[in-house]
Amino acid sequence: MAVLGITVALLVWIATLLLVSIWKQIYRSWNLPPGPFPIPFFGNIFQLDLKDIPKSLTKLAKRFGPVFTLHLGQRRIVVLHGYKAVKEVLLNHKNEFSGRGDIPVFQEYKNKGIIFNNGPTWKDVRRFSLSILRDWGMGKQGNEARIQREAHFLVEELKKTKGQPFDPTFLIGCAPCNVIADILFNKRFDYDDKKCLELMSLFNENFYLLSTPWIQAYNYFSDYLQYLPGSHRKVMKNVSEIRQYTLGKAKEHLKSLDINCPRDVTDCLLIEMEKEKHSQEPMYTMENISVTLADLFFAGTETTSTTLRYGLLILMKYPEIEEKLHEEIDRVIGPSRAPAVRDRMNMPYMDAVVHEIQRFINLVPSNLPHEATRDTVFRGYVIPKGTVVIPTLDSLLFDNYEFPDPETFKPEHFLNENGKFKYSDYFKAFSAGKRVCVGEGLARMELFLLLSAILQHFNLKSLVDPKDIDLSPVTIGFGSIPREFKLCVIPRS
């Protein structure tokens, strides 16, 4: 028995050495950037805090430099950290790294829509979507009027709270939801509409779940975890329900489609589908249209909603900043006229606060994963085709040199010595390059106009002492999720 035990131990030891040797050969087969040595099967997963991956990546960057390699499960990942490396990848090598890295929880939609599409259609679908969004007012007066109209409805709903505590999640969220719904579907919801609240609940829940440790682990080990129960199933179910809604809207539009008189973005996409009716390989299928609409609906609602909600929490933490905003609004806009885009140039403090909110909350800290579209030489390293590339946006937004004391909320980060707004090239909250957020112009306009409208009419009142307000996210992964809170809004007149 003793001899058998020694033999088994020896065989295990030899097998381990062989496995490590093979792993080293694979690991060194490319001239990859440096990084921590991966453990077979697990890779570097134990060197990451799944509750705060961005923080773990920052620590690794201090050790291995601004470009380093990780292995997570079977996935090879190159991380870019810091302004120079991130800008170089997103702008100077935008074509080589324009692919979308796999996100297994969205695997079903890998080659459809805009956000998660890594197939042959994504460039054309994205280009056309940008074009029609601009035609329907992206960055122009059309969207300004939409947002101003919705700001009026939002203010009226806030008045109905009569100074009593309320959770702002869905009440505030209805405003950006209605703006994007009008653009996509020529549709506006009442603030108590059951379907609207149901959709926003799906958006909100998914944004939270995507940022939890389980989903982070699932996206690295989906080959094994897909068979287990877990929140990945809930995310997929929610996505399916959202897509069923957009598919229903597309079918509804198709019944009354006039190709000479499009009513909204949905009609524009359907018209393209009609043009391809006899194509052997149509790009605009009903499925692709429904996923594209779902992408735009989710992104156009949840990101702006979360940013506004986080912004209100921050302003309650710093009432002196809120007071300065009231003074600027009263001086430039007054009590009755609707805030307008043209006011931004005369409201540097509000402009700075809006930018600082986006910088400070770090909404999508690690960016969505990119992918190398071909073998690429980058800074002397060879990054093979198919490698996942993560340009960390938080490494720009929290750069100590550009934003002194970056962990503190300071509108002065975007103001010069004369109190004028100061642009920073480090501000890449919407990413950059080929995969920059298609709704950046709309989101910037919404944040400025909606926040200005709220503060024009109301004082914010916290239910706790401002110094006790916790601004740290409840979870951070795919996104930075603010803690739940209630507040009161007190009419100013």
From Swiss-Prot:
Its main location: endoplasmic reticulum. Highest level in the liver and to a lesser extent in the kidney, with a higher level in the male kidney than in the female. It catalyses: an organic molecule + reduced [NADPH--hemoprotein reductase] + O2 = an alcohol + oxidized [NADPH--hemoprotein reductase] + H2O + H(+); (5Z,8Z,11Z)-eicosatrienoate + reduced [NADPH--hemoprotein reductase] + O2 = 19-hydroxy-(5Z,8Z,11Z)-eicosatrienoate + oxidized [NADPH--hemoprotein reductase] + H2O + H(+); (5Z,8Z,11Z,14Z,17Z)-eicosapentaenoate + reduced [NADPH--hemoprotein reductase] + O2 = 19-hydroxy-(5Z,8Z,11Z,14Z,17Z)-eicosapentaenoate + oxidized [NADPH--hemoprotein reductase] + H2O + H(+); (4Z,7Z,10Z,13Z,16Z,19Z)-docosahexaenoate + reduced [NADPH--hemoprotein reductase] + O2 = 21-hydroxy-(4Z,7Z,10Z,13Z,16Z,19Z)-docosahexaenoate + oxidized [NADPH--hemoprotein reductase] + H2O + H(+). Substrate binds at residues 298-303. CDD domains: CYP2C-like. Its cofactor is heme. GO terms for molecular function: 4-nitrophenol 2-monooxygenase activity; enzyme binding; heme binding; Hsp70 protein binding; Hsp90 protein binding; iron ion binding; long-chain fatty acid omega-1 hydroxylase activity; monooxygenase activity. InterPro entries: Cyt_P450 (IPR001128), Cyt_P450_CS (IPR017972), Cyt_P450_E_grp-I (IPR002401), Cyt_P450_E_grp-I_CYP2E-like (IPR008070), Cyt_P450_sf (IPR036396), Cytochrome_P450_fam2 (IPR050182). Pathway: Lipid metabolism; fatty acid metabolism. It is an enzyme of class 1 (oxidoreductase). The keyword Endoplasmic reticulum applies. Its EC number is 1.14.14.1, 1.14.13.n7. Induction: By ethanol and acetone in the liver and by testosterone in the kidney and adrenal tissues. PROSITE patterns: CYTOCHROME_P450. Belongs to the cytochrome P450 family. Interacts with chaperones HSP70 and HSP90; this interaction is required for initial targeting to mitochondria. A cytochrome P450 monooxygenase involved in the metabolism of fatty acids. Mechanistically, uses molecular oxygen inserting one oxygen atom into a substrate, and reducing the second into a water molecule, with two electrons provided by NADPH via cytochrome P450 reductase (NADPH--hemoprotein reductase). Catalyzes the hydroxylation of carbon-hydrogen bonds. Hydroxylates fatty acids specifically at the omega-1 position displaying the highest catalytic activity for saturated fatty acids. May be involved in the oxidative metabolism of xenobiotics. This is Cytochrome P450 2E1. The lineage of its organism: Eukaryota, Metazoa, Chordata, Craniata, Vertebrata.
